Amino acid sequence: MTSQGDTTSGTQLKPPVEAVRSHYDKSNEFFKLWLDPSMTYSCAYFERPDMTLEEAQYAKRKLALDKLNLEPGMTLLDIGCGWGSTMRHAVAEYDVNVIGLTLSENQYAHDKAMFDEVDSPRRKEVRIQGWEEFDEPVDRIVSLGAFEHFADGAGDAGFERYDTFFKKFYNLTPDDGRMLLHTITIPDKEEAQELGLTSPMSLLRFIKFILTEIFPGGRLPRISQVDYYSSNAGWKVERYHRIGANYVPTLNAWADALQAHKDEAIALKGQETYDIYMHYLRGCSDLFRDKYTDVCQFTLVK
């Protein structure tokens, strides 16, 4: 198989290393204070309102992995693998080989140590590598909460990077290939009007805060953009599954946990970082509550 569309204007795309590390390499110990024990850092899935965050994160991973029709011995690529919970879940419960890509040095070290504890003969690999640099055949692809970084790049092409992404992985998967893409989305103009959404100054200030203090360079796609670039590469969207309402209790649980560990957080990272992250988590909960943002799981098939 060959990779097509992995250049823009004749230049190899570069992963947004500095932008990603500015957030995810804060400190593993800091994130452990407020994420669930699996350290899953994306929207959970509360099948029942009485679920714990850990149970809801398990449900989210299962929801995503079940959509991939995994079979024992397949190779699953996890793009933006975070602290490895999805890879560990896939090895343990689906008996597959896994390759995880991260740009975070802290996540890489955590995942390497985690794999040493996993009792399975399957291949378990984590790399410090961007999707832009990956070029090996795989059977299935999962990406949970990483697509939001795929258009930031290193000053090149913006949303056109999606074209490269979808074409590359279309060509690296078999004829029955499947991809599960879980990403935050924003409404298009028509949906925003239907929802009665406005753009008050407080919203604009919060967006600026997020792009400055939390996720520099991050960009949120519209569903129509995922449709356009994925279909242009040959993918078909088998299912759109919108689960953004679940991010309200997820973010609230994170904020409550961080607040409960305030003294430890300040000892680790200082008062300013604690205040910034509390503002981030509470403010994002409001965005999902008011439907300025959503989460969609796209099941992509060939």
From Swiss-Prot:
**The protein's name:** Cyclopropane mycolic acid synthase 2
Record-annotated residues binding S-adenosyl-L-methionine?
A: 41-42, 76-84, 102-107, 131-132
Function, please? Answer: Catalyzes the formation of trans cyclopropanated ketomycolate or methoxymycolate through the conversion of a double bond to a cyclopropane ring at the proximal position of an oxygenated mycolic acid via the transfer of a methylene group from S-adenosyl-L-methionine. In the absence of MmaA2, CmaA2 has a non-specific cis-cyclopropanating activity and is able to catalyze the conversion of a double bond to a cis cyclopropane ring at the distal position of an alpha mycolic acid.
Domain of life assignment: Bacteria
Family membership noted in the UniProt record:
Belongs to the CFA/CMAS family.
Q: Which residues carry this modification: N-acetylthreonine?
A: 2
Identify the keywords attached in UniProt to this record, alphabetized.
Acetylation, Cytoplasm, Lipid biosynthesis, Lipid metabolism, Methyltransferase, S-adenosyl-L-methionine, Transferase
> Cross-referenced InterPro entries, in alphabetical order?
CFA/CMAS, CMAS, CMAS_actinobact, SAM-dependent_MTases_sf
Gene3D superfamilies, per the entry: Vaccinia Virus protein VP39
